[in-house]
Amino acid sequence: MSSWFLSLDNAAVLIDCPKVTEEVINDLKELSGGICPNVVLTNRDAHHDASILNRKLGWPLIVQEQEAYLLPHVENLVTFSEELTLSSGARLLWTPGPTPGSCVLHVPPPWNVLFCGRLLTPGSNDQISPIRTRSTFHWTMYQESLLKLRNWLPREQPPLLASGQRLHLLSDEKLLPWIAWNPSAE
């Protein structure tokens, strides 16, 4: 799972949580510049490390309510059901399928990036698409979430795409253009 740290105009957001080590803790403290970033978890893969980070730094964790039970002793736990807008203007959308509480985060222009966690996975030819695996929670819900996501995003300016999965397949590219989303794979 890949993590992303965003320094926005009036806030910071850590999207998914890296493996927590002392070096990572020090790097995150430096990146945060003394503010208290929100930690958004797009799926349950990083819950253990996120709870350690929360305990060490006190940063609030934001999860979709379906997965809040996995973080019983976390302070500053923020949950949402369908959608949530952060103070930075970034918006979260519940997109069940990969896990019951999967979500995506859209950061509006000027950044205009969709952080899609495990919802969309890089493949060959710089394409990104849904992948059904043994650990996929519910394939029909997954497909419905993809349709809901397409209707939720602003159509006038499609976002860049950032996946939390297997970035090494993307060679040097970290963000993909909207047209890399392969709807035929759905």
Which residues does each PLM region occupy?
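Short, compositionally biased "basic patch" segments
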Residues: 1-7
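A generic structural signal for short, solvent-exposed coil/turn residues
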Residues: 7, 53, 72, 84, ...
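Residue-level preference for short coil/turn positions at secondary-structure junctions
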Residues: 8-10, 35, 57, 86-88, ...
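Active-site HxH/HxHxD metal-binding segment of metal-dependent hydrolases
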Residues: 18-88, 181-185
